Amino acid sequence: MRAGASAPARRPWFNLSPMNRRRLDNFRRNRRGAWSLRIFLVLFACSLCAEFIANDRPLIASYQGELLFPVFVDYPEDKFGGFQARADYRDPFVANEIKAHGWMVWPPIRFANSTTILDPPTPLPTPPTWMLSDAQCRAALQKQGVKDAATAASPCWKLEPLWLGSDQDGHDIVARLIYGFRISALFGLILAGVSSVIGVFAGAVQGYFGGWLDLMMQRVIEIWSSLPHLYILIILSAILAPSFFVLLTILLLFSWVSLVHVVRAEFLRARNFEYVNAARALGLSNAKIIVKHVLPNAMVAALTFLPFIVNSSISTLTSLDFLGLGMPPGSPSLGELLLQGKSNLSAPWIGLSAFAVTALMLSLLIFIGEAVRDAFDPRKTFS
């Protein structure tokens, strides 16, 4: 290279076409959709790190000069002078032993999703700490053996905070909401992703080849779609042992149909276009024509439906949990909290908390879906 010649501009690792760049700009200019995506990603990232936010084990501990990581490793209690069992770091014996010979760093919330609150200030379900009276807090401190509990000026500040109270089983609601948000979001994203792949594949095969194959698959899909989905879901959920992947498989049996008609219509429209005929004339295989030439255009319609499929998947899981046919008993679930709220109308913090988180998550996904749909609409522009 000659002296003084400017170095060639480094190309980015990905290149957006002018049309996709316009779509991305339209999405960014849609403030409601863009901010909804940011908020959802932040909440989802926090839920993925739930063990570091809400846990009944310390993040880091030092005992007799040894650095321990209880959040990753299950240490036996005999390591701290106790019995041969899993260490309970909330046990006063274990906690005092570690504090006497080291230190502990706890997460912001010292409850996991299955941690049972010992010596609650009131009969379960316990209201949030900020709703308790000083007399209730003093009584709770006396149960825990805290000195000077009867004369403490601000006794509620000395209790472990229950920001949103507990449920009827003595579990911290904030911890249950964080872990329940993660399960719901992962369930919706996985179900939407897998069902979209199957639906796009089936629609592409139908639309591209057409003829008797399209006719036969269309009749099968019509029969399959006419089955009573809700009754089949209830029957299968009652017969099979409930689990995350069992529910995922059951719902996948019906959710893949939602994208077939959209993708099929796009392939039926595009299979006779000039660029497809030119690709056939050049000797390209059907698989290459479908994947490289027709599928990118058909995916535009599929992508606009994706956020709404995630929304529908989360709503279905929440409904099944509310009916008692979803996740196994004891699993953190937004639907199970809603059911507890219905059964405990005198404890409104349970139902209101679960409803607020569920409504927020579904609203964010709807706003994201509307923004994606408008971004792909060539007739809409945003200033």
Outline where the language-model segments fall.
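Alpha-helical transmembrane segments of integral membrane proteins
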Residues: 166-383
